[in-house]
């Protein structure tokens, strides 16, 4: 005949096994919402980075392809667009106070806004300021709330609507300790942009 102690242990084991699934479900370590919050905090700390990639830009019946080198260091940046892009390429050198646009022939012009320079010179409405966040897989942190957002099962940005742009994050790759966007498609009523990032470098 089984003893009272054996019965007690059996009942305790049954109780613990019944509770285990509920406990695991309550504290999901891979919850996308939690992962997204943690991911945002980590990516906001990436202030020094460099990407090498390619861009395809379509506006009306015109299209351009260019190589992209983007350097960012604590608010100071240099963006090089190389190849058959309008006048043969350009680069932007920006600080929080001023942005200088240099064309391939050496001609320069300056403004407080990179968007204003590109619009004036090339008639292109490229959201350079917001792209500094979008490229990392983050909503733009400026004074422009997003209209819609989707997160994938890994807590990564999948789709974003902000500043009249629709951004589709089509692929991520691991670079160092972070999974960062490697393919983006951006759609605007006036413009469409496809970006392929071949390499990400950043300071931990």
Region locations from a protein language model:
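Bacterial N-terminal signal peptides that target proteins for export
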Residues: 1-8
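Solvent-exposed loop/turn segments connecting transmembrane beta-strands
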Residues: 59-63, 84-89, 189-192
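C-terminal motif of bacterial Sec signal peptides marking the signal peptidase cleavage site
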Residues: 15-18
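Gly/Pro-enriched, hydrophobic low-complexity segments
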Residues: 137-204
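Beta-strand-dominated lipid-handling architectures at cellular/organellar boundaries
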Residues: 52, 64-66, 71, 76, ...
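An acidic-aromatic
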Residues: 76-125
């Amino acid at each position: 005949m089984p003893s009272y102690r054996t019965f007690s242990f059996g009942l305790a084991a049954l109780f613990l096994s019944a509770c285990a699934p509920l406990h695991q479900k309550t504290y999901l370590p891979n919850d996308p919402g939690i992962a997204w919050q943690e991911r945002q905090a980590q990516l906001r700390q990436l202030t020094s980075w460099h990407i090498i990639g390619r861009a395809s830009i379509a506006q009306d019946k015109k299209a351009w392809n260019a190589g992209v080198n983007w350097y960012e260091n604590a608010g100071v940046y240099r963006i090089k667009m190389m190849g058959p892009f309008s006048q043969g390429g350009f680069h932007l050198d920006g600080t929080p106070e001023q942005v200088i646009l240099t064309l391939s022939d050496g001609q320069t012009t300056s403004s407080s806004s990179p968007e204003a320079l590109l619009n004036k010179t090339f008639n292109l409405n490229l959201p350079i300021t917001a792209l500094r966040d979008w490229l990392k897989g983050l909503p733009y942190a400026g004074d422009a709330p997003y209209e819609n957002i989707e997160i994938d099962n890994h807590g990564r940005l999948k789709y974003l609507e902000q500043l009249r742009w629709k951004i589709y994050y089509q692929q991520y790759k691991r670079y160092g300790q972070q999974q960062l966007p490697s393919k983006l498609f951006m759609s605007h009523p006036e413009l469409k942009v496809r970006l392929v990032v071949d390499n990400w470098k950043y300071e931990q």
